Amino acid sequence: MVKALLVGSKVLIPNVDESRYIYSNGFYGKAIGISKPKGPKDIIRPLELSLIESVYLAKKGLIKVIDKNGEVLEYEKLYEYSSKIINKFDIMYRVYEDLREKGFIVRSGVKYGADFAVYTLGPGLEHAPYVVIAVDIDEEITPHELLSFGRVSHSTRKRLVLALVDRKSESVRYIMFKWVKM
């Protein structure tokens, strides 16, 4: 199991060989100081994982997260810690996990004004065809919010997907929007 260190809102894998291994198994994380690796061979520095990625990898048994006191944070504790730091973590994690289980590569979508950028092949191999916004199915979305979501996806030439999470059933439904010329 790969050793990872919890540092605030990030998790670091200091060993480069272990970083390369984790990256090669699904494009997880970002190598520190390397902006756009083309593949695992370009991972020559420690890897930085988001909390969402870390919780997922801990649940899968691929990483062991250790806090500053040397305590190992099992999946449940890491999930609880992440929930305190990230707004709507439960909703976002449920969508992340669902997309990963469906075989997609899921990265942060912050630069696109979304929760996630989603790839079918992976970063460096294609541009992300989708941006995903995670939403609680019981929350209302205003027309203004919907328009602003759509503008971002249109200006970046990506398809907008709303991921609707039902907390009761833990199911996720997806609605995709596409711009058309008329």
Curated annotation (Swiss-Prot):
Complex formation: Homotetramer; although the tetramer contains four active sites, only two participate in the cleavage. Therefore, it should be considered as a dimer of dimers.
Key words of the record: Lyase, tRNA processing
PANTHER family per the UniProt record, alphabetical: TRNA-SPLICING ENDONUCLEASE SUBUNIT SEN2
Residues of the active site: 119, 127, 158
Source superkingdom: Archaea
Name of encoding gene: endA
EC number: 4.6.1.16
MF annotations from Gene Ontology: lyase activity; nucleic acid binding; tRNA-intron endonuclease activity
Species per Swiss-Prot/TrEMBL record: Saccharolobus islandicus (strain M.16.27) (Sulfolobus islandicus)
Role: Endonuclease that removes tRNA introns. Cleaves pre-tRNA at the 5'- and 3'-splice sites to release the intron. The products are an intron and two tRNA half-molecules bearing 2',3' cyclic phosphate and 5'-OH termini. Recognizes a pseudosymmetric substrate in which 2 bulged loops of 3 bases are separated by a stem of 4 bp.
Any one cellular-component term (Gene Ontology): cytoplasm
Family the UniProt entry places it in: Belongs to the tRNA-intron endonuclease family. Archaeal short subfamily.
Pfam families: tRNA_int_endo, tRNA_int_endo_N
Record's keyword annotation contains Zinc-finger: no
Record field: catalytic activity: pretRNA = a 3'-half-tRNA molecule with a 5'-OH end + a 5'-half-tRNA molecule with a 2',3'-cyclic phosphate end + an intron with a 2',3'-cyclic phosphate and a 5'-hydroxyl terminus
The protein's name in its UniProt record: tRNA-splicing endonuclease
UniProt record, GO biological process: tRNA splicing, via endonucleolytic cleavage and ligation
HAMAP family assigned to the protein according to its UniProt record, in alphabetical order: EndA_short
